[in-house]
Design a protein with these regions (language model features):
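Conserved GNAT-fold acetyl-CoA-binding loop/helix
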Residues: 24-44
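A short helix-loop-beta-strand connector motif used in the catalytic cores of GNAT acetyltransferases and
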Residues: 45-58
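An amphipathic alpha-helix signature
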Residues: 10-17, 37, 41, 45
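Short, hydrophobic secondary-structure boundary micro-motifs
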Residues: 27-29, 56, 118
């Protein structure tokens, strides 16, 4: 499966919101309430101004968008970024998440070989736990609701 990667643009706001608000995605999100369109557009517009520092990547197969990844600089650790991955619910179960994770890690570590990636995963999201573990992320810590993984 040939997958392409590109940086998000303003044209992607609607598809990102629809993916984020899908019930299957919200179930394991850190903030499980639906996001209003106005809130999303405000956040996304501000985020696009920092896209070089904190990228959002979109992934496509045969020119159809299938998922995204986002890298957030952790302000308390300037050497760490939090990675978030989302697969279009219509494409779950096809190995797309592992391809997105791999491609994002390659892009990230090519740009930042001295930094690390951290993933916060809902304790009930066993698929994501397996995804990050299989990609070489090590369990860093646990809380009541989340597991934190890190890849150096």
């Amino acid at each position: 499966m040939e997958m392409s990667q590109r940086t998000a643009t303003v044209r992607d706001a609607a598809v990102l919101l629809s993916w984020r608000n899908a019930p299957q995605v919200r179930e394991f999100s850190q903030h499980s309430d639906p996001i209003l369109s106005e809130e999303h557009l405000e956040w996304f517009s501000a985020r696009l101004k920092r896209i070089q520092l904190e990228p959002i990547f979109l992934f496509a197969v045969d020119n159809e968008l299938v998922g995204m990844s986002r890298l957030d600089l952790l302000t308390e650790f300037t050497e760490k970024y939090e990675i978030s991955i989302l697969v279009d619910p219509g494409h779950h179960g096809r190995g797309i998440g592992s391809r997105i994770l791999h491609m994002t890690c390659v892009s990230f570590f090519n740009l930042h070989p001295d930094k690390s990636l951290v993933a916060r995963v809902n304790k009930n999201n066993y698929i994501s736990q397996k995804l990050f573990s299989s990609a070489g992320f090590k369990l860093l810590s646990t809380s009541d609701d989340y597991l934190s993984f890190e890849k150096l």
